[in-house]
Amino acid sequence: MLPMEHPLPLSFVLPNPATLPGLALGFIDGNFVDLQDLLLRASTLTSNLNHDCSDLNDRLLHLRTDLTKHAVSWISTSLSAKVSLEDLRLNLESLLCLPTDSVGKQTNWELQQVVEELCRIQNRRKYFVTALKLESLVGDLEDSVFHPISKRKGSTLQDLALKQERFSHAIKTMNEIEEILGDVTRHHSRWRRLVDSVDSRVDKSLSVLRPQIIADHRAFLSSLGWPPKLATSKVEHGEVDSIPNPLLLMQGDKKESYSQSFLLLCGLQQHNTQKEKRKKLNMTKETDNDGLWATDELVKPVASRMEYHFLKWAEQPEFIFELVYKVTRDFADGVDDFLQPLIDRAMLVSCSAKEAWVSAMVQMLSGFLEKKVFPGLIDMYKEKHMKSEGISSWFHLVDQMVTFDKRMQSFVNTDTCLSYEGSSTAFSQGISVMGLFCKKPEWLKTWGKIELKDAYRKSKEDIKNEKAWVIDSERTRLGNESNSQSAKYVLSTREDYKAPLVADSFLNRTWRLIDHGLSLPAILPRIQFIRATATRFLWCIFKILLLEFKKTDLSHYGLSEDTLIQACGPVNAARYLESKLREWSDDLVFVEMWAAETSVKVDRKPEVSCQGCFFGEELKSLVELETNWLMEIITVFLHQFDNLCSDHFHNNAVSWDEDVITSSSNLTVSQGVAEALDNLRRHLCVLHLNMNPKDFLDLWRNLAEGLDHYVSRKFFSGEPVLRRQKFDRFEVDAEALLTVLKPYCVRPGAFFPRVREILRLLRMHEEEKARLRGALSRSGNTCLKLFGISNLSPQLVEQFCRSY
């Protein structure tokens, strides 16, 4: 064992008294009685001296700052005044030397120079004043931030309160600095270097201040017993008791300390918000979905405890969503009651404690799904042997997400009044787990592909059903008989449009895709999803309708009633789809999306968004399909009519004498014309029973126009025959033609204007014909309206007058 070393004598440690100044010796003699007293009180004296030196240094720094500020202000003012007075003296002296005629121009020029110089001086003065004020505030901030951190951390609530007071002063100083910088940014854009310099110094202080405030806040939460247990073991009547909230158990100094810590976090967030707004003055504004930082600090420890359960339930997402909903609901009222007054004290505008809590919980869940769940589903979807299982899991998860968002929306809306459902502002992205797809466009695209393929597959199964395209003729007949004439055209349901059953299936699947798109909280991803799914699915439906119509054998050689009924199926379905698309497009949700799409043209050509509504291009294509199909049916009718009575309606037809069916006193309709009109009447009856009223109205009106052209052209195509019986025959056949449309309108002659005017010409007396010839020779074409003729061309009227 080594012998103990003796400490050195004091003579080797203390300085030689002979070398010390007199003031130092006097100070030591005044504070220490003897050597033993020196050993006992030396450390205390050293601490006091260091403290006094620190205070003196602080005072010296403030004195230097004040002295610099006053000196610069005085020097700047005096120099500016001296220079201005000297310039004014020189200008007045030079003004006396100028001739009288040039005094005015010189005076104006010099006054302009004086104004510019004064503005420059004023601008410099503002710069110096602003710089000195910022220097003073930044120095004060640095003192508040760095001075308390250099000391020993307090372990009591009093030490924490002192530290919070210093931090609060620092945040207040930062807000004052930010207010000045905001004014400089708006009105003095050339002072960029000053702003950057101040930002750099403030950021250094903030990099120390923010972690310290957050660390103290987390430590205080941990001391309160946060987070609590996620469930209790006490069960009564089959229900688990609600989870106790430690925030509501705080009293006295603890409650006040937490309140101050909460306000510090809110102050930091407010400062950060103002700073971001200042930096984005000249940039494109983006929607910030940051929640309340203080609420996020409550959720983070809860999330770490919940993740254990989440990992166990990765393949049973309904349990995950149920747990999050339960915890959110159990703590929401307590959080709202305790934190909302603090938010009001922090003067956070439009901030709800309940919504901030719900948003933080939802964002926590979204983060877990983003990191742990969806990557696995994407991998399963890419693997061929697991693709079907991946799609099934994907659908199940998305359904759970949509249901969860609706439950959360309903929960938040219990005591708040939000805008209409589906609006882009009704359910913020922060309170929607579906917002995950807004952040991940590639996942949104994958989801759209899965939904579209599934909808198309199910639609192909629907059209294979034997009754898919069946029209209930008996039901529509009874409906036609019971409805009034005006009510026939007030259509709303599938039965009103006489559409087949498959039309409802098409619409239901389309709306399901749209409804999934509307569950997205952001409007642009919503548009992208609906365009990628519902819109493309509509084009698939149009193709199915087109193929179904092409299956009908529309031929004028063997046109049957069954063929016409089969053709009515896709026509009615198209009209029903058109009505629903127009109804959806008038909804405010689609009006908003169309306006947003028109402004940014999301994945659409410019001309596509100019149709007047969200489904404008689809409606345009659907109307073209309906028009083409109706024209095809009309063309078949006209061809069949021409085949049956092609030798009639000529004014020189030789077969009229043989085809006349006589009665006791009057002429009757020709056999060929009667057969053609009977065919036409039967076909119209079939269409009237099986086609929707709107398309049937368009069909018979256009058919009447075609027959009107056909008959009038036939009348003027041959050589004139001056036999009264021929005229009577044409009149009888034409009148029979008009009666075919009698069941569908009151005045069928209004839809055959050319035939009606031919009959008028044939019924003219010789004197009236002579007047018409004379008027044509004198006035030309302008006189026809005086004789009630406006649809026949002047050339045809002249031909008639020359021939008869």
Swiss-Prot record:
Predominant localisation class: endoplasmic reticulum
Disulfide-bonded cysteines: none
What membrane topology does this protein have?
Peripheral membrane protein
Task: Quote the subcellular location field of this record.
Answer: Endoplasmic reticulum membrane
Q: What happens when the gene is disrupted?
A: No visible phenotype under normal growth conditions.
Q: Which PROSITE patterns does the record cross-reference, listed alphabetically? A: RINT1_TIP20
**Pfam families in UniProt:** RINT1_TIP1
Q: What induces it?
A: By salt and osmotic stresses.
Keyword Protein transport, does the record have it? yes
* Domain RINT1/TIP20 span(s) in chain numbering: 205-804
The question of whether Nuclease is a record keyword is answered with no
The record's Gene Ontology cellular component field reads: COPI-coated Golgi to ER transport vesicle; COPII-coated ER to Golgi transport vesicle; Dsl1/NZR complex; endoplasmic reticulum; endoplasmic reticulum membrane
Q: Where is it expressed, tissue-wise?
A: Highly expressed in dry seeds. Expressed at low levels in roots, rosette and cauline leaves, stems and flowers.
Supply one GO BP term: retrograde vesicle-mediated transport, Golgi to endoplasmic reticulum
UniProt entry keywords in alphabetical sequence: Endoplasmic reticulum, ER-Golgi transport, Membrane, Protein transport, Transport
InterPro entries attached to this UniProt entry: RINT1_Tip20
Q: Which family is annotated? A: Belongs to the RINT1 family.
Q: Main role?
A: May function in the anterograde transport of protein from the endoplasmic reticulum (ER) to the Golgi complex and in the retrograde transport from the Golgi complex to the ER.
**What is the protein's given name?**
RINT1-like protein MAG2L
Look up and give the organism this protein is from.
Arabidopsis thaliana (Mouse-ear cress)
